[in-house]
């Protein structure tokens, strides 16, 4: 298994109430992953991308896309695979929240505007 394959496995984090609750209480991180990825590949990808993190367990599930109506036509969202990654106690994956990044850039631009 090469490093290029490992970089393509993790598609992104899942930000939901359930994933936040699991992360805070049990140390579980939730990711969208490649639909053909195995549990071992997910474990290696997380340990490679987030240095110093030890993965204890990986649970995966396939999520069926919802059927949605767009006016008269019926469409369907894409299916995807999700992984619940349990980390060793006391460890955490550092991911930037989009809201925090926007708030930080807004604060820094307003500070520079006031200084000028």
Curated annotation (Swiss-Prot):
NCBIfam families (UniProt xref): PRK05738.1-3, PRK05738.2-4
Subunit note: Part of the 50S ribosomal subunit. Contacts protein L29, and trigger factor when it is bound to the ribosome.
Coiled-coil region(s): none
GO cellular component: ribonucleoprotein complex; ribosome
Its job: One of the early assembly proteins it binds 23S rRNA. One of the proteins that surrounds the polypeptide exit tunnel on the outside of the ribosome. Forms the main docking site for trigger factor binding to the ribosome.
UniProt cross-references to InterPro entries, sorted A to Z: Nucleotide-bd_a/b_plait_sf (IPR012677), Ribosomal_uL23-like (IPR013025), Ribosomal_uL23/eL15/eS24_sf (IPR012678)
Keyword Nucleotide-binding: no
Name of the gene this protein is made from: rplW
Gene Ontology molecular function terms on file: rRNA binding; structural constituent of ribosome
Record-level GO BP terms: translation
HAMAP family referenced in this protein's UniProt entry, alphabetically: Ribosomal_uL23_B
Annotated protein name in UniProt: Large ribosomal subunit protein uL23
Keywords: Ribonucleoprotein, Ribosomal protein, RNA-binding, rRNA-binding
Pfam families: Ribosomal_L23
Family: Belongs to the universal ribosomal protein uL23 family.
Organism: Psychrobacter arcticus (strain DSM 17307 / VKM B-2377 / 273-4)
């Amino acid at each position: 298994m090469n490093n290029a394959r490992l970089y393509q496995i993790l598609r992104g984090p899942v930000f939901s109430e359930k994933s936040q609750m699991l992360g805070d209480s049990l140390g579980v991180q939730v990711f969208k992953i490649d639909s053909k990825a195995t549990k071992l590949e997910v474990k290696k990808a997380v340990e490679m991308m987030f240095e110093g993190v030890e993965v204890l367990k990986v649970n995966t599930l396939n999520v069926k896309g919802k059927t949605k109506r767009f006016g008269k036509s019926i469409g369907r969202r894409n299916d995807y695979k999700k992984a619940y990654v349990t980390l060793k106690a006391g460890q955490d994956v550092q991911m930037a929240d989009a809201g925090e990044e926007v708030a930080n850039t807004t604060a820094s631009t307003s500070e520079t505007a006031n200084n000028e």
